[in-house]
Amino acid sequence: MTIFDNYEVWFVIGSQHLYGPETLHQVTQHAEHVVNALNTEAKLPCKLVLKPLGTTPDEITAICRDANYDDRCAGLVVWLHTFSPAKMWINGLTMLNKPLLQFHTQFNAVLPWDSIDMDFMNLNQTAHGGREFGFIGARMRQQHAVVTGHWQDKQAHERIGSWMRQAVSKQDTRHLKVCRFGDNMREVAVTDGDKVAAQIKFGFSVNTWAVGDLVQVVNSISDGDVNALVDEYESSYTMTPATQIHGEKRQNVLEAARIELGMKRFLEQGGFHAFTTTFEDLHGLKQLPGLAVQRLMQQGYGFAGEGDWKTAALLRIMKVMSTGLQGGTSFMEDYTYHFEKGNDLVLGSHMLEVCPSIAAEEKPILDVQHLGIGGKDDPARLIFNTQTGPAIVASLIDLGDRYRLLVNCIDTVKTPYSLPKLPVANALWKAQPDLPTASEAWILAGGAHHTVFSHALNLNDMRQFAEMHDIEITVIDNDTRLPAFKDALRWNEVYYGFRR
C-alpha cells in the first residue's frame, strides 16, 4: 500500500442538455468506457472515479463543492466531450480549491471518413468544447494543466499520471507537519524564513521541539528493541570490523539504533512527516543522528540539516511525488568542486545525512568514525556512492515577497577513486550546462547550499510543482545562458511585483 491508495481523482464530463437525452446517454457510455480503460491499462498512480455529467451550472457547482470537502479527492480531470458553455463553470471553478487537469481528448482516435455526419460532429466536440473551457480558465486567471492526446495513448497516460502525483503531493502537503529539533544553525540566513507565509502558500506547518523532549523518548526505548533493530542492520548492510559484535565501536551502533527508534516514535506520535536537526542543538543525545536520519529518509520522511525546514518539507513533497518511481530522492549539499578543464565536477554530500535510496551499492557500508563537529561521540553512518545518470537538484528559497524554486539539471557520474578517507555517502555530478554557468546562475538566483537531489524526478515534474503551487521557478540546464538568465530574473522581479 502506498500514499496514492489514500486518494482518488474525480473524472468530470462537461456537456449540456441542448443535445438531447440520446446524445447525453452516449456521452455517459463513452465516459464509463474511458475511465474503466484508464484505471485498467494506464498504470495511473491512483484511481479515477467517474462523476455524474456536468450539464448545468448547479450540477457543476455541486461537483466542485463536493470535491473541496472530500479529503480523498486529490483533484479533478475534466473532459469536454461535447460543447459545454463555460459560463456554467464559473461558480464551480471560483470555489474549487483542488488541482484541475483538462484532458483534451475524444472517444474516437480517427475520423470515420465514409460515415461521418452531423450527429457524429455534435457528439464529438472536444476540439472546440475544450477551447471554450480554456477561455474561462484564462479569463478567471485560474491555473490548470492541459493534456492533449487520445485516451489510449501511452504518452497521455504518463502525463496524467505525473499530474496525479503532483495532485496527491499537494493534498499531502496540506497535512504535512514539520518538526524542528532545536533551531536554525546560528547566524545562517538561507535556512531561516517566514513559517507563517509557508503555511499560507503550501499548507505545511513548522514548529520547534526541544531536543530534551526527543531525548526523553530515546531513553525510553528498550534494549530488546535496540537489539532487534541492530539485527536488521546486520542483514541490510556491510558492517565494518569496528561495528561488528565485540568491535570497538559496537556501542555507538547500539546508541544509533536507540536514537533511530526514539526519533521514529516521536515523529509517529506527533504525526510528523518531515524534521530537522542541527549539530548545535544536541543536548542529551550521545551522537549526531546520522544513521537514524538516513534510514528515516529512506522510509519517506523529509529531512534537512541545520534547521532547514524548507528543504525538509521539499524533500517530503518530492518523496511523495516520486513514490513507486525508479530512482531515489535525498537531502544533499553542494560540498566541494573538482576543477579540471573539460571535466568540472561537483562532489555532493553532507556531514552524514544522505538517503540510501540513491545508493549505487545494494548493501551500503555501516561504519562509525569521528566527526569533528558537534562535540559528541563518534556517530554511525551509511557510506555509499550514488547511482549514475540524469538527475536534478532543487532548492526552495524565501525571497520575502514570494518563494522561488531553483532547479539544476545534472548528470551524475561514477566516482573515479575509492575515497578511502572520506567516511560519508556522496554523489558526484556534472552540472548543466557547465560548472561555471550553473554555479554563477545558482548564486545570482539566491539558491541555497542545501538541495533535494533526485534521480526519480525530472525538470517537468518540478515545473508542474511550481505551477500547481503558483510559485516562481528558475531553471538551470543545457539551454541556460547567463545574460538571458539574468534578464529572466529581472523580468520575474517585475512580474511578481505587479502581483503583490
Curated annotation (Swiss-Prot):
Keywords: Arabinose catabolism, Carbohydrate metabolism, Isomerase, Manganese, Metal-binding. It catalyses: beta-L-arabinopyranose = L-ribulose. InterPro entries: Ara_Isoase_C, AraA_central, AraA_N, AraA_N_sf, Fuc/Ara_isomerase_C, Fucose_isomerase_N/cen_sf, Lara_isomerase. Pathway: Carbohydrate degradation; L-arabinose degradation via L-ribulose; D-xylulose 5-phosphate from L-arabinose (bacterial route): step 1/3. It comes from the Bacteria. Gene3D superfamilies: 3.40.50.10940. HAMAP family: Arabinose_Isome (MF_00519). NCBIfam families: PRK02929.1 (NF002795). This is L-arabinose isomerase. It comes from Escherichia fergusonii (strain ATCC 35469 / DSM 13698 / CCUG 18766 / IAM 14443 / JCM 21226 / LMG 7866 / NBRC 102419 / NCTC 12128 / CDC 0568-73).
